Amino acid sequence: MNGTLTLTAAVALGVVWAYHAAAFQADIASVKFQDVAPESGLSFVLHNCPTPQKHMIETMAGGLAVFDYDGDGRPDIFFTNGAELPSLIKTGPQYWNRLYHNEGKMKFRDVTEEAGVAGQGYSMGAAAGDYDNDGHPDLFVAGVNRNILYHNLGNGKFEDVTAKAGIRSGEWAVAAGWFDYDNDGFLDLWVVHYAKWSPAYDRYCGNQTRGIRIYCHPKYFEGLPSTLYHNRGDGTFEDVSTKAGIASFAGRGMSVVSADYDRDGHPDVFVTNDNMPNFLFHNRGNGTFEEVGLSSGVALREDGKAVASMGADFRDYDNDGLPDIAVTALTGETFPLFRNVGKGNFADATYASRIGALSSRHSGWGVGLFDFNNDGWKDLFTANSHVNDRVELFESAVYEEPDSVFVNLGNGTFRDASTGAGLNESKAHRGSAYADLDGDGKIDVVVASLGSSAELWHNISPETNHWISFRLTGTQSNRDGIGTHIRIGNQQNDMISAVSYASSSLDGVHFGLGRTTSIDRIDIVWPSGKHQTLHDIKVDEVVNLREPR
């Protein structure tokens, strides 16, 4: 890192969003990662408690979050963990959720006990966001019949405020995301549920004659709708699912991501569903949503088939200024890539981008669109593994797989750079999170795996390209600036927290700049509608950006 720059910047109200002269050329320079978890102090192992009964929840654990909980400028790492089955009780430290403090220089320290975040129940997903705008990011943990909202006290400790905040439990929640759907300056919470389930559910799936039991197909589970909690601004939340018009849309939800895909100033929501059509909830701007997944072209593949949609990211991969949607799925289904073509419509670009051919033999969970080689084009990382640990007995597929990275060539297509990148660890990968963990200007990756140690992929790609990152402080908007749009040249990136599979990455907004050595102009639009313009900005900096009042 060359330094940190704090700016309040010039304000230009009513600026028209437009492309600027600078364009970024794709650089096929190698992307390279090294797993430094063993020497970093990151010793987390995800204990999902596999049983002979093959409870579905066993194969779906693994969400995590990266966020700077203590405000020291270094992103920390939180992992969700399982529990004993069938009791759903964390009977020992092996089942604790874990928080690791970033000590700097890729070293981490377990602070779970002192922070008070070991948790309860069988945990699934994590979402970080400062819901009370006090400058200390809070944490929501989604789980099976037990959700937890932790309030960050600002002294290295968290308080469980679930009950008094009005957050309910009792259903199987997989993932969640913070976003300000009504732009009132307070983050709201969207919680995704999978299906009706209890430990007493004991359907036998597989080949009973051969004594081979497997996890049941999703079709045997009745899906559930998501829950939307409106932040009242006083530390409490109201369930507005019915009022907002989402309560009637039941699905087997896996992940949630939010972005303003039609640039009308109101954040929209995409929910992946397992072997059901995906949901795209268009924000009408009056407190209600319209489900438009089918009409917009993101509910199904181009051939009209639903896939086992797992994780998702909602960012602009082709630098046309509109956020696109990347999804992971099972082997043989490909990883759908939906290109935003404007006017509320998406085109299936899975095969046109070559992601279809490159991903057809993989099963994916976590996913992220980030510029790993800083050439100005977002690449695609996927955390891979099949859902069924006995799949080799029935199909020509494998259970444990290495992760993948597909490099964006800047012409609408990708190439598989996984082998050369060093992604060679075959595990039952699940959630993934993304952040510049050591401040060197390159995005690193953390991946959780069932029954195995977490991976900490340090980005050691050649430092031939430049970059800039923004840490946002909202004043009229939510404190984290979630939902902010930033444009540099032909690039646009949004401040998004929910990402991947059941995971969260709260680490500002990052841009790769290629060989660009100075930036003439940067345009920012905050969720409040406030426009901001920066001029003549240095590269290779972390910019602390505060919303003007």
Task: Kindly give the residue locations of the regions a language model identified.
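Gly/Ser/Thr/Pro-enriched helix-cap/hinge segments flanking short amphipathic alpha-helices
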Residues: 23-32, 50, 54, 354-357, ...
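Beta-propeller blade repeat segments, especially FG-GAP/WD-type strand-to-loop junctions
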Residues: 24-34, 85-111, 146-160, 206-207, ...
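Repeat-based blade/solenoid architectures
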Residues: 42-63, 115-127, 166-177, 221-224, ...
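Short consensus segments that form the blades of beta-propeller domains
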Residues: 54-57, 86-92, 215-220, 270-271, ...
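Beta-propeller blade termini
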Residues: 61-71, 101, 122-137, 151, ...
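Hydrophobic beta-strand segments that make up the repeating blades of beta-propeller
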Residues: 74-81, 134-143, 189-193, 268-273, ...
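Short, conserved, GDST-rich strand-edge loop motifs in beta-rich repeat architectures
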Residues: 80-94, 194-221, 382-399
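Asp-box/WD-like beta-propeller blade repeats and closely related beta-sheet repeat scaffolds
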Residues: 113-128, 142-181, 191-219, 223-225, ...
